Amino acid sequence: MGLEKSFILFSLLVLVLGWVQPSLGRKPSVQDFKRQHMDPDSPPNSRPTYCNQMMKRRGMTKGSCKRVNTFLHESWATVKAICSQRQMTCKTSSRNNCHKSSSTLHITDCRLKGSSKYPNCDYTTTNSQKHIIIACEGNPLVPVHFDASV
């Protein structure tokens, strides 16, 4: 009887872990990338409130303030095409699934101001034209992670 209960409890535990684990170890997705980084319809602008508005609108100030984020002011086709560039090691990890843009892109960098604390997330807005490095996955390859701008 005790062995039977243990088996039932173990089976239940395996089921629960199988249900919970995918959300814990969730891989980055193309939808996350688009939400966090794509803003093709807005040209880069120097409005100091751009980052504050966009970070909040895109859900990056829920529960805490995301420290750094980059928005890309290019078409999805332009960004996706970077995945066809030569593969390289990522700058922020040892993964080897990154690709660097062959030309500079219009970007906006958002950086949390040093004195800013949740829930009042306050960002500096910096526009520039830089090469970007993104991680790509899947078949066909699609952007899933913004790695760096150089």
UniProtKB/Swiss-Prot annotation:
List of residues binding substrate: 35, 66-70, 91, 111
SMART domains documented for this protein: RNAse_Pc
Active site location: 37 (proton acceptor), 145 (proton donor)
Catalytic activity: an [RNA] containing cytidine + H2O = an [RNA]-3'-cytidine-3'-phosphate + a 5'-hydroxy-ribonucleotide-3'-[RNA]; an [RNA] containing uridine + H2O = an [RNA]-3'-uridine-3'-phosphate + a 5'-hydroxy-ribonucleotide-3'-[RNA]
Signal peptide positions on this chain: 1-25
Top-level EC class as recorded in UniProt: lyase
GO molecular function per UniProt: lyase activity; nucleic acid binding; ribonuclease A activity; RNA nuclease activity
CDD domains linked to this entry: RNase_A_canonical
GO biological process: defense response to Gram-positive bacterium
PROSITE patterns cross-referenced by the UniProt entry: RNASE_PANCREATIC
Pfam families named among the record's database cross-references: RnaseA
UniProt keyword list: Disulfide bond, Endonuclease, Hydrolase, Lyase, Nuclease, Secreted, Signal
Principal location: secreted
Subcellular location: Secreted
Cysteines joined through disulfide linkages: 51-110, 65-121, 83-136, 90-98
Entry's EC annotation: 4.6.1.18
Functional summary from the UniProt entry: Endonuclease that catalyzes the cleavage of RNA on the 3' side of pyrimidine nucleotides. Acts on single-stranded and double-stranded RNA.
Family: Belongs to the pancreatic ribonuclease family.
Quaternary context: Monomer.
Protein name (database record): Ribonuclease pancreatic delta-type
Species the sequence originates in: Rattus norvegicus (Rat)
Gene encoding the protein: Rnase1d
